[in-house]
Amino acid sequence: MNFGMLKLLTVLIICYSNNFMRTRGGNGK
């Protein structure tokens, strides 16, 4: 696996997780 790909995947996951938490928690953090 490529390091750049891993980094991109991590950023994608973090972004998705953040969006999910915001949608679920309302105002959230």
From Swiss-Prot:
Domain of life of the organism in this record? Eukaryota
Q: Which terms in the GO cellular component ontology are assigned? A: extracellular region
| MF (Gene Ontology) | toxin activity
* Subcellular location as annotated: Secreted
Region forming the signal peptide = 1-15
**Hey, what tissues is this thing expressed in?**
Expressed by the venom secretory cell of the spine. The spine is a cuticular structure containing a single large nucleated venom-secreting cell at its base. It is an independent unit capable of producing, storing and injecting venom. On the back of D.vulnerans caterpillars, spines are grouped together by 50 to 100 to form scoli, of which there are eight in D.vulnerans.
Write down which residues bear the modification named Asparagine amide.
Answer: N27
On whether Nuclease is a keyword of this UniProt record, the answer is: no
Keywords tagged on the record: Amidation, Secreted, Signal, Toxin
Q: What is its main location?
A: secreted
Job of this protein: Probable toxin. Does not show insecticidal, antimicrobial and antiparasitic activities. Does not induce increase in intracellular calcium in mouse DRG neurons, suggesting that it does not induce pain.
Q: What's the family?
A: Belongs to the limacoditoxin-12 family.
Name of the protein: U-limacoditoxin(12)-Dv72
